[in-house]
Regions:
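Electropositive, gly/pro-rich neighborhoods at or near active sites that engage anionic ligands
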Residues: 1-83, 99, 131-249, 405-407, ...
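Short glycine/serine/threonine-rich phosphate/pyrophosphate-binding segments
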Residues: 110-116, 282, 287-294
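A short helix->loop->beta-strand "cap" motif at the edges of active sites that frequently abuts
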Residues: 124, 305-309, 343, 381
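Short gly/pro/ser/thr-enriched loop/turn and capping motifs at secondary-structure boundaries
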Residues: 133-139, 287, 309-311, 316-320
Length: 428
């Protein structure tokens, strides 16, 4: 009905303009107006036709504006039934986020998704480059059964960047229970697996999945090839498979990919090249961050990049992977695998951890990571100490605190909010 009202308005505007400019095909209407004026006034008034035309134009424009307003409201009600009153806020938010810096994040596991939940509040120009070496759980089973790259970490990143209803997030994270073949699989993993087979390509599958979840940014696998992560221990033994590495509880000398030369996803390299800032972690040092650096071209792209390159250090050591590691040892391991210049700065926690929580983690063999400042300085890396944790029943990085401090570093390592910053020269 509003479109009909708009059409009536257009007709009235056209009629009014014709009357104003004395269009010849409206002689009948003009004559009728003259007769009416003559009967009313007793004389002819040629200005009345012009005034009548102007009045008709005004009425027509008014009807068009009213119709347009209600048409827009009807469309918004359909597309945004619960948020129609927030349209201006939504438009403003999208414009603000669209002007944010280009940030590329590298990693995998739970830690990366925590960072993404915070970063998406500062910019929508986010690219997550995700490890594909996972071989455990639902991801490992789908990898073996369907021959696809493991979808678990990709799913977590999609959900973290999603701007959708909580129910959709719960759906993608839902794990089937019971004793059937579906037991242990998450719906999101199955969805990505199905989308990959339907589209024939995992990159396309992720793009289409991003539309379903209204993702802010993009999620990219580091590679589309099937890879295995192996670890060489200090005693020379080799452990095959990402999920088996922490189980042996030996000191890791180095990790490697099999096959040794793995082709990268070009879109991932482009995201790193075009980034204003590149963030590594947080996440498992050897099993979430390192596999990305071992993909051909990734470490080289990082070294050549002029972006601010930040490593977010873990808060606690990880049993079987980083036992006894200090902050500088985390950074040195990254430099040993990726080369000098893959990171410029570190973000480390300086918030105290309660004795009760330390005792709880000590039972699992995990301890707070010591920030050894002099050793970090010796590596030529700048660092920022800040409160970046959320201590509840477990110790986790806090998304908002991570975002605030990362953006501070991206904007120039400005001090404030009770944190200490230490700038070192950037690598050339």
């Amino acid at each position: 009905r509003w479109l009909l009202l708009f059409s009536v308005g257009v007709m009235l505007v056209s009629l009014g303009l014709a009357l104003v400019f004395n269009y010849k095909y409206l002689d009948v209407i003009e004559e009728a107006i003259f007769r009416a004026v003559y009967l009313w006034k007793g004389s002819y008034n040629y200005m009345f036709t012009t005034l009548a035309g102007i009045a008709v134009v005004i009425v027509g424009v008014g009807l068009m504006l009213i119709a347009t307003r209600f048409v827009i409201r009807s469309v918004i009600t359909v597309l945004l039934p619960d948020n129609s009153e927030r349209l201006v806020d939504i438009i403003y938010e999208k414009r603000r986020l669209g002007k944010g810096p280009n940030i590329a994040v590298i990693g995998g596991g739970h830690g990366l998704s925590v960072l993404l939940r915070g970063i998406k509040a500062a910019t929508s120009n986010v690219s997550a480059v995700v490890t594909v070496a996972d071989d455990g759980g639902s991801s490992g089973r789908l990898r073996e059964d369907l021959g696809i790259i493991p979808p678990g970490d990709l799913r977590n990143c999609l959900v973290a960047l999603a701007d959708t209803e909580p129910l959709m997030e719960k759906l993608f994270q839902y794990r089937f229970k019971g004793k059937s073949e579906l037991a242990g699989h998450s719906f999101g993993n199955l969805f990505i697996a199905a989308m990959t087979e339907v589209t024939g390509d995992v990159e396309t599958a992720l793009r289409e999945s991003s539309k379903v979840l209204a993702v802010k940014g993009e999620v990219l696998p580091a590679s589309k090839e099937h890879v295995r992560l192996d670890a060489i221990m200090d005693d020379g033994t080799v452990v095959e498979g990402e999920s088996h590495i922490p189980e042996v509880h030996k000191h890791i000398r180095r990790v490697k990919l099999f096959p040794p030369h793995v082709q990268p996803v070009q879109a991932a390299l482009d995201a790193l090249t075009n980034a204003d800032a590149i963030i590594l972690g947080p996440g498992s040092l050897y099993t979430s961050i390192m596999p990305n650096l071992l993909v051909d071209g990734v470490a080289e792209t990082l070294r050549k990049s002029k972006a601010v390159k930040i490593y977010i250090c873990n808060v606690m050591t990880q049993p079987g992977e980083t036992d006894g590691y200090t902050a500088s040892m985390h950074a040195k391991a990254i430099l040993d695998h990726g080369g000098q210049g893959v990171i410029d700065y570190m973000l480390v926690n300086n918030a105290p951890i309660s004795k009760e929580m330390q005792a709880y983690y000590a039972k699992e063999g995990a301890y707070p990571v010591e920030v050894d400042e002099e050793a970090i300085n010796a590596l030529g890396i700048g660092f920022l100490k800040a409160d970046i944790i959320n201590e509840s029943d477990v110790i986790r990085h806090d998304p908002q605190k991570l975002c605030r401090n990362v953006m501070k570093m991206v904007d120039g390592l400005r001090p404030g909010n009770g944190s200490d910053h230490y700038m070192r020269s950037r690598h050339n």
